[in-house]
Amino acid sequence: MRPSVWAAVAAGLWVLCTVIAAAPRRCLLSHYRSLEPRTLAAAKALRDRYEEEALSWGQRNCSFRPRRDPPRPSSCARLRHVARGIADAQAVLSGLHRSELLPGAGPILELLAAAGRDVAACLELARPGSSRKVPGAQKRRHKPRRADSPRCRKASVVFNLLRLLTWELRLAAHSGPCL
């Protein structure tokens, strides 16, 4: 082959690679509409284990307040809510000691890592300003809450893990990207 042909092929490959690399990431959450049963069973087992542990604490100085309902599905707030829940769950589960982890906790951590990356990609695609609040809407002021102990915080995140995986992540997958 002549040098000009090689140059043309090289230029074509360079353009192709540049276009592929510059292509925006897609927001793909549809595969979280139904999760692998083994992962859900591991999340249930972890929750049950922590429930038994919490009952053995004696004095109940943890207040497991019910969570507010997640934001409406038409807003980017749901994706941000799910992203915060995933980050909390990853932090707590990766900080557990070996004795506290169940054998099936590995798939939970893998699922959380993948879901965290996918939700972050969806949030990156959101146009700036699309999730702004309605002008004039006032934020309710809440009394400052007493901070929970690390043990209570860990138990709360573990108790809410199943809800995060089976309800909140699924709703985010059904609602699609926020644009």
From Swiss-Prot:
<protein>
    <recommendedName>
        <fullName>Interferon lambda-4</fullName>
    </recommendedName>
</protein>
<comment type="function">
    <text>Cytokine that may trigger an antiviral response activating the JAK-STAT pathway and up-regulating specifically some interferon-stimulated genes.</text>
</comment>
<dbReference type="Pfam" id="PF15177">
    <property type="entry name" value="IL28A"/>
</dbReference>
<dbReference type="InterPro" id="IPR038326">
    <property type="entry name" value="IFN-lambda_sf"/>
</dbReference>
<feature type="signal peptide">
    <location>
        <begin position="1"/>
        <end position="21"/>
    </location>
</feature>
<keyword id="KW-0202">Cytokine</keyword>
<dbReference type="GO" id="GO:0005737">
    <property type="term" value="C:cytoplasm"/>
</dbReference>
<dbReference type="GO" id="GO:0005125">
    <property type="term" value="F:cytokine activity"/>
</dbReference>
<keyword id="KW-0732">Signal</keyword>
<dbReference type="GO" id="GO:0038196">
    <property type="term" value="P:type III interferon-mediated signaling pathway"/>
</dbReference>
<keyword id="KW-0963">Cytoplasm</keyword>
<dbReference type="GO" id="GO:0045087">
    <property type="term" value="P:innate immune response"/>
</dbReference>
<dbReference type="GO" id="GO:0005615">
    <property type="term" value="C:extracellular space"/>
</dbReference>
<keyword id="KW-0964">Secreted</keyword>
<comment type="similarity">
    <text>Belongs to the lambda interferon family.</text>
</comment>
<dbReference type="GO" id="GO:0005102">
    <property type="term" value="F:signaling receptor binding"/>
</dbReference>
<dbReference type="GO" id="GO:0007260">
    <property type="term" value="P:tyrosine phosphorylation of STAT protein"/>
</dbReference>
<keyword id="KW-0051">Antiviral defense</keyword>
<dbReference type="GO" id="GO:0051607">
    <property type="term" value="P:defense response to virus"/>
</dbReference>
<dbReference type="InterPro" id="IPR029177">
    <property type="entry name" value="INF_lambda"/>
</dbReference>
<dbReference type="GO" id="GO:0050778">
    <property type="term" value="P:positive regulation of immune response"/>
</dbReference>
<feature type="region of interest" description="Disordered">
    <location>
        <begin position="130"/>
        <end position="149"/>
    </location>
</feature>
<dbReference type="GO" id="GO:0098586">
    <property type="term" value="P:cellular response to virus"/>
</dbReference>
